[in-house]
Amino acid sequence: VHRRVKGSYAVIALIAGHGVLAFRDPFGIRPLCMGKSADGTVMLASESVTLEGTSHQFDRNIDPGEAIFIDLQGNVHAKQCADAPTLKPCIFEFVYLARPDSVMDGISVYQARLNLGETLAKRVISTVPPNEIDVVIPIPESSRPSAAQLAQLLGLPYREGFVKNRYVGRTFIMPGQAVRKK
């Protein structure tokens, strides 16, 4: 698959009568991890936080280009299948897609978002006169940690100015601008 399919993917597939196969693209663009429960069952997930809700403890990340096969007896078999795997995760996972309480490839999503706020604060300090900013307002939900960090470092008030409609899906993935505006 790695030689034929270019792009980002983390795949989990049930092979009826044999077991479960999981693999990640050679650059580890999309996250994939494995957890184990006290009784020895194995769970695969895109985010570590998913494991916690099912009494599984994080065991390890599936490496870029690695395949995991879990047979019917629960035995885990791992093999590196890519020629030159290199970790190059998608920044969008850390900025927007992942839950803040997840850890992906050893990086806390929450901490990554705080770091983004700190980086932005340094840039703002060097480019914007202090009296030109009145308040820091996040765009819900994922920008909250970054905005809070930015407000703290700039000594500005942090306010919730937008309310997310929880009954509407993610607008950036809707098929066209007209639908997104609607």
Name every feature range the model reports, one short phrase each.
Residues 1-182:
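PRPP-associated nucleotide enzymes
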